[in-house]
């Protein structure tokens, strides 16, 4: 893979550099996210974005940017870049000669005879940003000015000039502290050497965020600066800026930075970059570990957690079994109520939990017995909830369920399959909505929900049998055959006998939806499949023909009249396209797993080609990571979250499949 590095020509081209974002995170939940030239293009961008427990634990942008100015002979050279209406000002990107992502995001500026290096990182376990400035070359006396711009607002919002903001700065050792509004933490801004802080509070107006404008959202913001630091800096000298929610000792900043840089791994190769990206999703907060679904706008979400967990934790060179178990334990102990995780209305989330357990089994000490001891009760609770039905007692209001014989919106029908339907609410992972209605409504029997249901029932019976739960086995032993028989009878389509496949969902009176979607492939890839080898081969072929791209699987065949090949524009446009052709990398795991299941070592070359195709893409969009989605049409440009846990997990799972296949060659 090309080293995660960019030269002056690339950095100076804003059409190129503003489309590439860097991300630095820590275990405490904080992160830094901006473009590789440090020009914010999203409301989610900022140097310090971190959870604020006094405001519900949501993420807030405290420090939006830090503008650097090099001063020589009373001439000022501003290294920052911002977009204002009709102009970029200042245009500090013209001074950038190099950007490197490893071991930590590093920018080198050339201003005449001055060569200045900037290294940025988040402290591993604290809400603390460190930026080290090193003057590599200078032909005359040099001063450095640092001006912080403060936001103190939700990452989902924008700030505007107001009378409530406290523009004062209060002295602390080595710097100042500011807090624009009550209930926020103090932002302690300190430097590692003696410096003057010049108090000069002022609002700067109409910062523009290009990506928000493209996405159809408000995109202008006002930011407050309380003043600036100014200090001399000598050739060969380093100065460290610290932004933190806790006051630190200035003389400790150098050692803290050195300790943090030493723990960074080199990320110049494809797999180390993926391993590093995977670890960025793990957050330790309130004494438990969670898995963030993606950056920069997602929090932890149960569906994404169960889909991605094994790939994030169990593919690392140093296995993270304890973290995997801790996350699963937390969900069972704190989020499972009456067989449903949290209050999320979803027919599939609980069933992905079983798949996560299946993948954990071979890594946890005690194997099947330990899985059953820890999770057997939860597994049975979920199955009983699905069998007996989840309905209006969990609805938010009386309109959230049918007032007829199907008032329980998720339940097992007489044929053993799971029926899921609620007016005005999507219940599967294809869950976007426009104008209060699902875009991709899939009511009734959804194919992947029932494949997951079959897998969950079979796996629970397997463990119950091994561990001696005879009563459960006796009660459920006939279910797998019943589900399997009716699964094929319900979903199998032979409109074209030469190319049969599965209906995406089946509604009233057996009406089969014939859209070619990737959900049917999940029925082939799970450890327990309700399909035989012939059926799996047919589905694999249809998937390869209509849905496979170099970046994942399309959510709908291009031959469909509803197909949308570009996922761009305002929220309505993006929601319309999201599951109508947009490509998702996480689905590739199921495609490759099915390929190995059907063709064994004969599939190795194609699997390698698919995985290798992502190497160069780590230089795009969210550098060093894998995005949430891509356009369905070539050239398959990235869209959605810049770094998405299920996407990264899928590629790491594919790498493990390839490695296992090679070991058995």
Residues of each region from the PLM?
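C-terminal capping/lid segments that line or modulate ligand- or cofactor-binding pockets
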Residues: 2-54, 342-366, 500-543, 566, ...
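Internal amphipathic alpha-helical repeat/solenoid segments
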Residues: 283-305
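Acidic/His metal-coordination segments adjacent to aromatic residues that form catalytic metal sites
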Residues: 283-291, 333-344, 419-445, 509, ...
């Amino acid at each position: 893979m090309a080293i995660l590095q960019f030269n002056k020509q690339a950095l100076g081209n804003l059409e190129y550099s503003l489309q590439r974002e860097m991300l630095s995170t820590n275990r405490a939940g904080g992160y830094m996210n901006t473009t590789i030239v440090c020009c914010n293009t999203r409301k989610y961008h900022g140097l310090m974005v971190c959870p604020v427990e006094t405001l519900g634990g949501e993420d807030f942008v405290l420090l939006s940017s830090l503008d650097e100015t090099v001063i020589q002979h009373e001439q000022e050279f501003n290294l920052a870049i911002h977009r204002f209406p009709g102009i970029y000002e200042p245009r500090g990107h013209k001074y950038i000669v190099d950007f490197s992502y490893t071991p930590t995001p590093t920018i080198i500026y050339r201003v005449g005879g001055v060569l200045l290096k900037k290294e940025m990182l988040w402290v591993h376990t604290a809400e603390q940003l460190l930026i080290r400035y090193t003057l590599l070359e200078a032909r005359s006396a040099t001063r450095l000015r640092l001006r912080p711009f403060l936001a103190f607002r939700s990452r989902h919002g924008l700030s505007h000039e107001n009378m409530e903001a406290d523009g004062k700065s209060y002295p602390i050792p080595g710097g100042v502290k500011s807090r624009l509004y009550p209930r926020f933490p103090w932002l302690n801004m300190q430097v590692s050497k003696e410096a003057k802080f010049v108090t000069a509070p002022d609002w700067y107006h109409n910062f523009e965020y290009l990506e928000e404008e493209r996405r159809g959202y408000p995109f202008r913001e006002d930011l407050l600066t309380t003043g600036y630091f100014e200090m001399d800096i000598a050739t060969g000298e380093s100065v460290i800026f610290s932004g933190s929610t806790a006051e630190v000792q200035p003389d400790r900043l150098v050692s803290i930075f050195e300790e943090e840089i030493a723990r960074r791994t080199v990320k110049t190769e494809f797999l180390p970059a993926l391993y590093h990206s995977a670890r960025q999703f793990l957050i330790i907060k309130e004494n438990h570990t969670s898995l963030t679904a993606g950056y920069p706008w997602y929090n932890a979400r149960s569906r994404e957690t169960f889909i991605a967990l094994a790939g994030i934790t169990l593919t690392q060179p140093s296995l993270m079994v304890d973290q995997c178990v801790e996350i699963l334990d937390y969900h069972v102990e704190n989020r499972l109520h009456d067989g449903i995780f949290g209050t999320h209305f979803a027919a599939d989330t609980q069933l992905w939990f079983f798949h996560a357990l299946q993948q954990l089994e071979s890594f946890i000490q005690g194997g099947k017995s330990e899985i059953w001891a820890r999770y057997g009760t939860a597994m049975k609770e979920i199955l009983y909830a699905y069998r007996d039905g989840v309905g209006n007692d969990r609805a938010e209001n009386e309109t959230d369920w049918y007032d007829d014989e199907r008032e329980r919106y998720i339940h097992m029908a007489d044929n053993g399959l799971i029926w899921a339907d609620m007016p005005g609410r999507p219940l599967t992972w294809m869950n976007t909505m426009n104008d209060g209605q699902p875009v991709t409504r899939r009511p009734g029997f959804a194919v992947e929900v029932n494949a997951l249901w079959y897998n969950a029932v079979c796996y629970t019976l397997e463990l119950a049998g091994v561990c001696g739960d005879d009563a459960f086995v006796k009660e459920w032993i006939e279910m797998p055959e019943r589900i399997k028989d009716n699964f094929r009878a319900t979903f199998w389509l032979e409109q074209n006998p030469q190319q049969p496949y599965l209906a995406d969902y089946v509604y009233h009176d057996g009406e089969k939806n014939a859209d070619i979607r990737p959900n049917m492939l999940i029925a082939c890839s799970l450890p327990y499949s309700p399909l035989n080898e012939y059926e799996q081969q047919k589905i694999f072929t249809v998937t390869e023909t209509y849905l496979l791209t170099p970046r994942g699987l399309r959510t709908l065949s291009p031959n469909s009249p509803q197909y949308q090949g570009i996922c761009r524009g305002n929220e309505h446009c993006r929601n319309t396209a999201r599951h109508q052709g947009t490509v998702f990398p996480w689905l590739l795991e199921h495609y490759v797993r099915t390929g190995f299941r059907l063709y064994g070592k004969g599939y190795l070359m194609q699997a390698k080609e698919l995985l290798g195709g992502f190497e160069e893409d780590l230089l795009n969009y969210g550098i060093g990571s894998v995005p949430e989605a891509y356009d369905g049409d070539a050239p398959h440009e990235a869209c959605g979250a810049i770094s998405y846990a299920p996407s990264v997990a899928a590629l790491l799972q594919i790498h493990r499949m390839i490695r296992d296949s090679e070991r058995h060659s």
